[in-house]
Amino acid sequence: DANFMIERGQKIAFVGKNGEGKSTMVKCIMQEIEHNGTLTLGHNVMIGYFAQNQASLLDEELTVFQTIDDIAQGDIRTKIKDMLGAFMFGGEASLKKVKVLSGGERTRLALLKLLLEPVNLLILDEPTNHLDVDAKEELKRALKAYKGSILFVCHEPEFYEGLATDVWDCSQWTTRIL
């Protein structure tokens, strides 16, 4: 059994070894796995979810710029080029088609797209997979600046230290899907 509450602005890292139930818990929260538990969301909670396969769900026929332009709203629209540059898609890189991007580039693009969505709770399942050191640092900076709450699965202390307000070690969990 798990019973927890995520407070506004809290940034929680689920840490532990492979196979300890971190991603399973996330999949239960996201209703991707049947279970007997309940999830109660607070008033006006909007979840943005980054699954481990999120980068593969991007439209391969769009360019990097089009992918972000499609989701950006309001004041963000005037900052698209700056945001693309911050995620290492400046200049010509923003004109590349998604289908020619590397795994790390796709992951960066999928994460940037998620950060632009009008959500206030991010649930990220191993968001640093396929990212190089510079991309991880940029993601960490963006998540630190994010005003909403974050629950993320991570294996890398150098990433979650200084980002997470709380670190939940999953090594003592017993994860059973009933």
Q: Can you describe what each PLM-predicted range is?
A:
Residues 1-178:
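ABC ATP-binding cassette signature C-motif
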